[in-house]
């Protein structure tokens, strides 16, 4: 587990200049120092403690699985950077969730209760330019029972995934796992639109359930000459169970940072930022006795920001025809126009009756698996790799249809609930070529990508668009089933992912590897 400690005592002007040049945009001012900010807060009678950040990687999955029975179906190309907070002296620490995101220093945790009179403040330089940056908080566990008398539960039972989405905390059966979003995220587009810049810029984030705390923190920042446009508040909704006692809700906050322009390999600026973010985390609370909190509105089913998309369903006939052409190319033709028995359509998780949307999950005690409105999620599960199976995933390419800034096509380990392998959208471009799949319209808007144990020897059929799925513990080991998942992130010109009901679900076709 990578522990990340940051102390921004003072940000030199020269660093500001270098970072600004990388983004071709000069920031308006240098950020404040930790000591300066802390001193002003304490003058106002606030208690202040400093936390740190911790990178959660695929390698950390086994420990998380021991604690929570899940690895959260992560996106392997965007490891979580988790906020690790110092516990308040009177805060209950649930031993059942300690280490949920890896070991932390004594007195610190990546999951925490919320004092109704507190705020978490994160500030500093954002990372180098990338396809996506987002900061979001989640309800992690709660006391109670999940509901089974609803259409969502019935659907999930039907596909055999009820233990994924409806479950108790393994070592505390009085609580259920949630991981439900609590707000619309503060992502790079939101930050750009409000402040005029995001990547490589100094910005401030307040996470709080209390309007009074938001106002007080902002007043201190204004006193330090911070412009209001550079401050972003995540409003934790009032329909959570606040408090520091054992019965209160448990929360988590994290950062997603995806597909940096510099490639993200070791030694790059983005790699360094991800492993040691130039951010500071402070936990702040009001010490006034008996002050009533001014809570924010509840987070309800219709609260998430409304999303748009280009309607892709006009491409359905072309998709079905492409599935036919792919099958013919393999000499394993479909039995009918829908390729029944061999091809299966992905499931859209965000529309009814699945409803993988934070407040809708919370209403029935469902685990939303760290959902976000910044992407659409479609999946299909129940596939093995032990008997020479070859799978073709055929779908629309969101970057070509106008529904995504970037696309992710992944393979999940169903047992560990782990995002094991991933194909970035740039590697899907050109995979649906008319030379290989003739007679299909709009091929430039599609992809065809293959998954099997060993791609070697299949080049004439896959044309190089193939991923060899490893049989290691943290990939898809023998006997473990896999799930395919497609994510479309951030519709161009908007600040959210696509309205998933307008996204044409991909299809997966199963073939048998040809005899040598």
Located regions from the model:
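Bacterial signal peptide processing site
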Residues: 22-24
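A compositional/structural signature for long, glycine/proline-rich flexible linkers
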Residues: 27-516
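Bacterial N-terminal signal peptides that target proteins for export
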Residues: 1-8
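Alpha-helical transmembrane segments
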Residues: 12-15
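C-terminal motif of bacterial Sec signal peptides marking the signal peptidase cleavage site
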Residues: 17-20
């Amino acid at each position: 587990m990578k522990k990340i400690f940051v102390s921004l005592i003072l940000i030199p002007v020269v660093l500001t200049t270098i970072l600004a040049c990388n983004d071709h945009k000069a920031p308006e001012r240098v950020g404040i120092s930790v000591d300066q900010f802390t001193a002003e807060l304490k003058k106002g009678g606030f208690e202040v403690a400093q936390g740190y950040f911790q990178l959660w990687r695929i390698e950390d999955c086994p420990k998380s699985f021991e604690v929570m029975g899940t690895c959260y179906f992560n996106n392997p190309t965007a490891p979580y950077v988790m906020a690790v907070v110092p516990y308040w002296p009177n805060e209950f620490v649930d031993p059942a969730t300690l280490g949920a995101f890896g070991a932390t220093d004594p007195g610190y945790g990546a999951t925490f209760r919320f004092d109704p009179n507190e705020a978490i403040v994160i500030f500093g330089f954002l990372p180098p330019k990338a396809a996506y940056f987002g900061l979001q908080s989640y309800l992690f566990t709660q006391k109670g029972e999940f509901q089974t008398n609803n259409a969502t539960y019935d659907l999930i039972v039907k596909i055999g995934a009820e233990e994924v989405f409806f479950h108790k905390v393994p070592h505390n059966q009085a609580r259920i796992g949630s991981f439900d979003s609590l707000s619309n995220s503060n992502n790079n587009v939101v930050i750009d639109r409000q402040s005029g810049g995001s990547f490589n810029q100094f910005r401030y984030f307040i996470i709080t359930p209390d309007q009074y705390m938001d106002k007080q923190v902002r007043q201190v920042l204004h006193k330090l000459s911070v412009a209001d446009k550079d401050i972003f508040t995540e409003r934790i909704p009032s329909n959570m169970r606040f408090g520091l006692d054992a019965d209160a809700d448990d929360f988590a906050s994290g950062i997603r940072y995806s597909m940096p322009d510099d490639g993200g390999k070791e030694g790059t600026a983005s790699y360094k930022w991800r492993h040691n973010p130039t951010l500071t985390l402070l936990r702040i609370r009001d010490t006034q006795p008996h002050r009533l909190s001014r809570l924010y509105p509840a987070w309800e089913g219709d609260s998430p920001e409304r999303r748009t998309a280009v309607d892709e369903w006009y491409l359905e006939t072309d998709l079905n025809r492409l599935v036919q052409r792919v099958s013919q190319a393999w000499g394993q033709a479909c039995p009918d126009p829908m390729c029944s028995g061999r091809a299966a359509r992905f499931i859209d998780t965000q529309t009814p009756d699945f409803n993988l949307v934070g407040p809708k999950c919370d209403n029935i005690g469902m685990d939303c698996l760290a959902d976000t409105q910044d992407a659409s999620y479609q999946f299909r599960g129940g596939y093995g790799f032990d008997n020479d199976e070859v799978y073709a995933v055929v779908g629309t390419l969101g970057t070509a249809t106008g529904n995504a800034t970037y696309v992710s096509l992944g393979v999940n380990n169903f047992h560990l609930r782990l995002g094991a392998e991933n194909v970035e959208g740039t590697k899907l471009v050109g995979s649906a070529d008319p030379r290989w799949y003739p007679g299909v319209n709009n091929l430039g808007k599609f992809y065809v990508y293959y998954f099997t144990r060993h791609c070697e020897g299949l080049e004439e059929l896959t044309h190089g668009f193939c991923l060899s799925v490893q049989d290691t513990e943290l990939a898809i080991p023998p006997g473990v089933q896999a799930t395919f998942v497609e994510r479309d992130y951030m519709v161009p010109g908007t600040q959210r992912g696509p309205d998933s009901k307008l996204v044409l679900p991909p299809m997966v076709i199963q073939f048998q590897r040809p005899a040598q």
